[in-house]
Amino acid sequence: MVKPTGPTDVNVRKLIRQLEKTKRPIFKYIAELLSKPKRRKKHFVVNLWKIEKHSNDGDTIIVPGKVLGSGELTKDVKVVALSFSQTALEKLKDKAIYLENFVEQAKDKKLPNTKILI
């Protein structure tokens, strides 16, 4: 039988538990994605051009992985991710929000126009 694996980073484990406690379906789905083994999360890396392609003005885009800085983002969107590359942070400036901070801010708020990009 295969040994179950998951994230070894303590901070990611805490985040998964925090997401599961919120009891919101979107956060539970993100927790499920984050608890997958690393070999199955390689495609959780998203470039800015993909966010530009799949978003509209006013959207909140959640990436359960890393955002890279390839491409440009001209639309007015908030980008929430587990981590950002340095070039992505420079291009996004105040539009970038870390997932831990977003969960604390959005516990009791409605989340209209929210999309998960994988």
Swiss-Prot record:
KW Ribonucleoprotein (keyword) present: yes
InterPro entries: Ribosomal_eL18_arc (IPR022947), Ribosomal_uL15/eL18 (IPR021131), Ribosomal_uL15/eL18_sf (IPR036227)
Keywords for this protein: Ribonucleoprotein, Ribosomal protein
GO biological process, one term: translation
Membrane-crossing segments per the record: none
Coiled-coil residue windows: none
Record Pfam families: Ribosomal_L27A
Gene Ontology CC annotations of this record: ribonucleoprotein complex; ribosome
Family, as annotated: Belongs to the eukaryotic ribosomal protein eL18 family.
Name of the protein in its database record: Large ribosomal subunit protein eL18
Lineage summary: Archaea, Nanobdellota, Candidatus Nanoarchaeia, Nanoarchaeales, Nanoarchaeaceae
Protein encoded by which gene: rpl18e
